[in-house]
Amino acid sequence: MTQETLRKLWITLAILTLVVMINIHGSTQKSDFALIIKLPIELKFDGELTREAYAVHGMRFFALFFWLVPFLAVYHAKRSSGSASEAFPFRLLDIEPRSRPGKWVQGIAFVVLICLPLLTAIHLWRIVVGMQVCQHVSNALVNCADIWSRPVNAGPWDDTYRLANWGPTYDPLVEPVLAVILTAVSVYLTLRLVIEMRRAGSRPVATGNTPAEPITTSVT
């Protein structure tokens, strides 16, 4: 895969992730603002969801998909050289990443596409940890406990547990542990990206293969 193809793949995934996270963040605040991207498939939540339900779905999306954004950026940075700004895969029109305006553009892109989703995840996580998991029995919620507990034994595929306020089906203990692990992976990859960008800045610019000198013969 060429660097150009990798950049196209990365920017597509990064923008889609940013849009979803911003929209979910707004939904937890009961905001009417939403970013819309026309796609062959439509991504939306049906029905009136509670603030807690949006937070749960947002953490699920973030944990499952966001780590790919810094992962691809790290892969791009490891194959780059010349400057740290060029190692970051964002490109805007014909602005040279090593130029002064280019460095500003790359810095802003890093904050928006990498840091902003991480901050949104913190916001969603604060909502999730404040909720309770309850057993759903005969139109009633019983045996409520925090998200790290399993009040009663339940099979992995049933509908035993729901979040408070008749939220989505939720597997306590398992889901928050997986979310913490995958979020930690995303944070690690983000830190690794910063390191690889600095390393790229210390590597000499790749100049490619120089053409061979023509072979001349003399006739005596």
From Swiss-Prot:
Keywords (alphabetical) are: Cell membrane, Membrane, Plasmid, Transmembrane, Transmembrane helix
Transmembrane portions of the chain: 9-29, 54-74, 105-125, 177-197
Which portions of this protein are annotated as coiled-coil regions?
A: none
Keyword Cell membrane in annotation? yes
The cellular location(s) given in this protein's UniProt record come to: Cell membrane
- Where does the source fall among the domains of life? Bacteria
Primary residence: membrane
Q: How does it sit in the membrane?
A: Multi-pass membrane protein
Give the GO cellular component terms, alphabetically. plasma membrane
The name under which this protein is listed is Uncharacterized protein y4fD
Which organism is this protein's natural source?
Answer: Sinorhizobium fredii (strain NBRC 101917 / NGR234)
Q: Lineage of this protein's species?
A: Bacteria, Pseudomonadati, Pseudomonadota, Alphaproteobacteria, Hyphomicrobiales
